[in-house]
From Swiss-Prot:
It comes from Streptococcus thermophilus (strain ATCC BAA-250 / LMG 18311). It is found in: Cell membrane. This is ATP synthase subunit beta. Produces ATP from ADP in the presence of a proton gradient across the membrane. The catalytic sites are hosted primarily by the beta subunits. It catalyses: ATP + H2O + 4 H(+)(in) = ADP + phosphate + 5 H(+)(out).
Amino acid sequence: MSSGKIAQVVGPVVDVAFATGDKLPEINNALVVYTDEEKSRRIVLEVALELGEGVVRTIAMESTDGLTRGLEVLDTGRPISVPVGKETLGRVFNVLGDTIDMEAPFADDAEREPIHKKAPTFDELSTSTEILETGIKVIDLLAPYLKGGKVGLFGGAGVGKTVLIQELIHNIAQEHGGISVFTGVGERSREGNDLYWEMKESGVIEKTAMVFGQMNEPPGARMRVALTGLTIAEYFRDVEGQDVLLFIDNIFRFTQAGSEVSALLGRMPSAVGYQPTLATEMGQLQERITSTKKGSVTSIQAIYVPADDYTDPAPATAFAHLDSTTNLERKLTQMGIYPAVDPLASSSRALSPEIVGEEHYAVATEVQRVLQRYRELQDIIAILGMDELSDEDKTLVARARRIQFFLSQNFNVAEQFTGQPGSYVPVAETVRGFKEILEGKYDNLPEDAFRSVGPIEDVVAKAKAMGY
């Protein structure tokens, strides 16, 4: 192992000088430095640039407090490597693969894999046309997810991305029964803690590996923790031949961490101050999240949209990699419609008659047509009132409002806040319910009966309780 000395520390970026003639560490290699003689505190650095004359620029994976010039730095000779395999299930890791769940640490000889790898080649890839049922009406009807596909949940601050991803974990991980990997990237530690204890109580933790690099951690950790979670998922896919669910909350923080260190690494910022390598970094991560002939990875990624601006380079770059997009809309939260999924902006490659069937496709497109027409009529209603509409449009508006409310439902994970039990609605029930609303079967029921309910039978029961 070659060794060098710290030449400069600027926040999370550390320059390390190696003696001329020594072999320089390769890009992405992990370097180790101890802050005291007893070697009680270890800091891991990752090589990002070679500056020439034996100096490399590195990004710290932990806080650089305690580092001083002249400290010895050792080259490990390989990238950061993390534990993989069945032993990772039920455990919680940080970016370096160290356990953080207060239970027994992993043995030094446990199987490990480097976090930097190449994406699968074209001939290894496979595509699926099997629908992944989520039990959430608005998703299953209008923007269905594919098994082995990539899903993005887009939304601004506080519109319900994390609650939706937790409900998907609750519904899919429990129904699916396979292996799940949850990766928390730059989000709140409290949410990760809540999720861990909920999973422990429900028993899902036994089939889940969790990896966290939260908001309070340096940008190096937030930039690489997604790769740690992905490496664990890839092992289950490639070696064990499993179908894996990969949840990532939040992909935007991965980009944000990259932009934090980009200027310190000496790169010129590009649009909106992001790193010039934004598209490359996103591509390298996303191309590894894929399904191969050995096994599948179904990934569900929350993506924060800064200031609700979908043209921002970070969410715009992520769009290109996804099969399905679920867009959360602030206006719907203001109307009290949860989940606040925009039925017209959300889209899916799976919404075609060949994949979902003729009936489902016909109902979904008619629902979208009715909602689109309602949106067009809203300006007229705001200026002239409902009376100026034709009878046909009045009926359409009444049905559109019922559809809009029926797209909401109670979540299991929100039961402690709402006091209402959550509901899981099978796809067939969802399609039947919306078909009957479109046919006018429930035109006589009040709009409020359609709010936050499960299947259409719940609407009828609610209306009955209201005296209809």
